[in-house]
Amino acid sequence: MSRTWIRNPLAIFTANGLDAAGGLVVEDGRIVELLGAGQQPAQPCASQFDASRHVVLPGLVNTHHHFYQTLTRAWAPVVNQPLFPWLKTLYPVWARLTPEKLELATKVALAELLLSGCTTAADHHYLFPGGLEQAIDVQAGVVEELGMRAMLTRGSMSLGEKDGGLPPQQTVQEAETILADSERLIARYHQRGDGARVQIALAPCSPFSVTPEIMRASAEVAARHDVRLHTHLAETLDEEDFCLQRFGLRTVDYLDSVGWLGPRTWLAHGIHFNAEEIRRLGEAGTGICHCPSSNMRLASGICPTVELEAAGAPIGLGVDGSASNDASNMILEARQALYLQRLRYGAERITPELALGWATRGSARLLGRSDIGELAPGKQADLALFKLDELRFSGSHDPLSALLLCAADRADRVMVGGAWRVVDGAVEGLDLAALIARHRAAASALIAG
């Protein structure tokens, strides 16, 4: 692949403090050189891209999502419900999911993410009703088609209503089925090393939808194959009450009891922790995905990011949903994180750079990846470029701050592994209008039953 100079950006955020005011050089899918202001590339470049009207970021990394939920956005019966009633109302609808509907939902979620500057996305898929046993295979095909990177987690629910869990019986699976499929997916799809496009993690859904046995067994499989672990934890006080009543343990004690407290694990939400639990999470190096939009939408609470980071727990961001956000937009999620965390910690402490760092380098750490999430020689050439020429940016002065403060919501250019996947604000090779029409029809059919 020829060398390309992304030249003289309006502003650039490297996520590591390195100077790249003069741009960067891409070759063979990687960044090979950062340039200071006025510097020229060390070797000739076959092509140049004038970035003088663009703010350049590392490709954003989304560390918690449920792609299938794009089919149930803004559904009236759940608009004003908190988490547990929200789930109980939606479970029967989601149980009607089919491979065709999942493919459309996944494509919509990934296209929306890509257009928002996201190049890597983790999805937590835990629904495998009859006929949808190959759900992760469906998702892997869409990831390849759109040319993104993904951490596809093999979620699971094994604790149904009849045994004291939250989900209805038609949405749960036996432990043997879950573990066999986990092994199959790791063998078939999990790529290792720099530049991996698809990786697999194991993700029993939550304390109120899986048994301790499947948590322990999943941890053993993950350790044996050196893959990561993911689950929802400490999202609501209802969940905390469930753990106390069923297990006699608070959430972090429960996590520890099933062998999950460690650096292999990242958790979605992580809101309701006391000081001792924060200390233990930090010492273990367990990561936390902050989902500000979802947490506000469901009135769940505010993640204690500052204390968690100070204790040693990595922090990343996730859009969650898309029935609890209800968008799949990573640059807007960084804005939400900025504002929600300022509400807790004050304006001086939570800066745009901190929020963007969570959305890039921090999120990459949650996924165990050191090759993405920042701009430096040797890193993957995953880039998000935003123009500031819309009405909302008129009168802004600091380009990097303007991305979040003025609510940027769509990238002009996005590069994944050295290849442009978004050009002039459109996904390459994707008929978006046709996709929207098919997706809307599928969403209506799902609700209608």
Curated annotation (Swiss-Prot):
By its UniProt entry, which InterPro entries does this protein fall under? Amidohydro-rel, Metal-dep_hydrolase_composite, Metal_Hydrolase, MTA/SAH_deaminase
Where do the annotations place Zn(2+) binding? Answer: 64, 66, 232, 269, 320
Q: How is the cofactor bound?
A: Binds 1 zinc ion per subunit.
Sorted alphabetically, the Gene Ontology cellular component annotations on this record are: cytosol
- What reactions does this protein catalyze? 8-oxoguanine + H2O + H(+) = urate + NH4(+)
Q: According to its UniProt record, which cofactors does this protein need?
A: Zn(2+)
Keywords attached to this Swiss-Prot or TrEMBL record, sorted alphabetically, are:
Hydrolase, Metal-binding, Zinc
List GO molecular-function terms, semicolon-separated.
8-oxoguanine deaminase activity; deaminase activity; metal ion binding
Report the EC number(s), separated by commas if there are several. 3.5.4.32
Q: In which pathway does it act?
A: Purine metabolism
Quote any Pfam family the record assigns: Amidohydro_1
The reply to whether Zinc figures as a keyword in the UniProt entry is yes
Q: What is this enzyme's class at the first EC digit?
A: hydrolase
Q: Which family does it belong to?
A: Belongs to the metallo-dependent hydrolases superfamily. ATZ/TRZ family.
The protein's role, per its UniProt record: Specifically deaminates 8-Oxoguanine (8-oxoG) to uric acid. 8-oxoG is formed via the oxidation of guanine within DNA by reactive oxygen species and leads, if uncorrected, to the incorporation of 8-oxoG:A mismatches and eventually to G:C to T:A transversions.
What's the subunit arrangement here? Homodimer.
Protein's name according to its UniProt entry: 8-oxoguanine deaminase
Organism the protein comes from: Pseudomonas aeruginosa (strain ATCC 15692 / DSM 22644 / CIP 104116 / JCM 14847 / LMG 12228 / 1C / PRS 101 / PAO1)
